[in-house]
Amino acid sequence: MKAKVIVGMSGGVDSSVAAWLLKEQGYQVEGLFMKNWEQDDHNDYCPAAKDLADAQAVCNQLRIPLHTVNFSKEYWDRVFAYFLSEYEKGRTPNPDVLCNKEIKFNAFLNHALNLGADYIATGHYAKNTIEGSIGYLFKAKDREKDQTYFLHAVEPEALSKTIFPIGDFTKPQIREFAKQLGLVTHAKKDSTGICFIGEKRFKTFLNEFILAKPGEIKSTGGKTLGQHDGLMFYTLGQRQGLGIGGLQNSTDEPWYVVDKDIASNTLYVAQGSQHPMLYSQGLICGPIHWLADYENHLPLTCFAKTRYRQTDQACMISPPDNNLHYVMFSSPQRAITPGQFIVFYEKNQCLGGATIEQIIR
C-alpha cells in the first residue's frame, strides 16, 4: 500500500491542490488543520474559523478526513515570545521562519507521525530531494513564489519526511487546477502579512504587548527633526509614516530610516533613496543553519538573499569567528536589516541561513 501523507491544510488554494495532487498520485491522504493563535476569537470576523471551514469543505470535496489540532501554546512559547523579544530590542524579526522551523516542520510533523503518517506535505512553493534520513532543499519552479527563504531553518531530518507537491507548478497552474476541480478555495486571495495580526494595524497590535518608548528623530548630521513613536515601529529603509516632511532648508526628497540607536533611543533618517547610509558592503550573521555540507568549505563564494523575493546576490562567507560569520557582497546592498535572515544558495539549492546581527558599511 502506498505511503500515508498528512497534508497541512491552511484553507488556502495551495494546500488544497497539494492534497489533490497527492491523492492523484495514489497516496493515502489525510488533512490536518492547525490553529496556532487564540486571540482572533473575540473579533466579529474570525479568519481561523473561515480557514477551517474552507479546509473542511475541500477535504469533503476530495473525500479525505480532516484532523484539527491546537498549537497555540507551542506557537506562543516558540515563535511569538521570540517575535516580541526581538521587537523590544529594536530589531525586525521574521516570524514565518520560526513558524516553519518550530511549528509546521516540528510540532505538526511529530503530531502527524503519531497519527501514523509516513510523510507530511504542505502547500509551500519549494522542492526537495531525500537521501536516507536527510532532505535537501531546492527552489520551486515558480521563482516568483519560491518560499525556500522561509524554509531555510527547517531541520534536514524534517525535510526527509516532507513532500512539496506543488513545487513543480506555477501559481497560475495551481489556481487553474483548483478552478477545474471546483474547489471552494480556487479564487481565495493569498494570505499576506504576519499571520497573527490579521487585519489589525501593526502599531495597534504591538502596543498591546510592548510599551512604546517615543524618542527623537535625527538627521545623520545630528539635527533633531521630530519625534518617533518607538523604535520598534520602524525598519531600515522605511519611507512612509515618518511625519517629517516640509522642513525648512531641506529639499523635497523623501526621508528614509537609515539607523536605529537603541542605547539613546534615536531614529536616524536621511534624504534620498540612494543615500549612502542605506547601503552596506556586508553583514555579520550568527551561526549558520546548514542544509548542505558546506560548513567545511569556508570561505565560500555563493549567492544570498537578505529578504524574501530579492534577486540572488553574489557574496563570500567567512569561516566562523566566535560563532559569527562575516558575509561580504560583490555590490552594495540596500536596507539590510538586523533581526531578519540571510539565506544562502548555490544555483537552485538552498544551503541554509542565519540571523543578521550587524551591518558592515
Swiss-Prot record:
Stretches the record annotates as Interaction with tRNA: 145-147, 307-308
Superkingdom of this protein's organism: Bacteria
Ligand binding (ATP): 8-15, 34, 123
InterPro entries assigned: MnmA-like, MnmA-like_C, MnmA-like_central, MnmA-like_central_sf, Rossmann-like_a/b/a_fold
Region span, Interaction with target base in tRNA: 94-96
Entry function: Catalyzes the 2-thiolation of uridine at the wobble position (U34) of tRNA, leading to the formation of s(2)U34.
Active-site annotation: 99, 195
Catalytic activity: S-sulfanyl-L-cysteinyl-[protein] + uridine(34) in tRNA + AH2 + ATP = 2-thiouridine(34) in tRNA + L-cysteinyl-[protein] + A + AMP + diphosphate + H(+)
The EC number(s) this enzyme carries: 2.8.1.13
Subcellular location: Cytoplasm
PANTHER family: MITOCHONDRIAL TRNA-SPECIFIC 2-THIOURIDYLASE 1 (PTHR11933:SF5), TRNA 5-METHYLAMINOMETHYL-2-THIOURIDYLATE -METHYLTRANSFERASE (PTHR11933)
Residue numbers marked as site, Interaction with tRNA: 124, 340
Organism classification: Bacteria, Pseudomonadati, Pseudomonadota, Gammaproteobacteria, Legionellales
Annotated disulfide bonds: 99-195
Name of the gene encoding the protein in the UniProt record: mnmA
GO biological process, one term: tRNA wobble position uridine thiolation
The protein, known as: tRNA-specific 2-thiouridylase MnmA
Keyword field: ATP-binding, Cytoplasm, Disulfide bond, Nucleotide-binding, RNA-binding, Transferase, tRNA processing, tRNA-binding
Protein family membership: Belongs to the MnmA/TRMU family.
GO MF entries: ATP binding; tRNA binding; tRNA-uridine 2-sulfurtransferase activity
GO cellular component terms, A-Z: cytoplasm
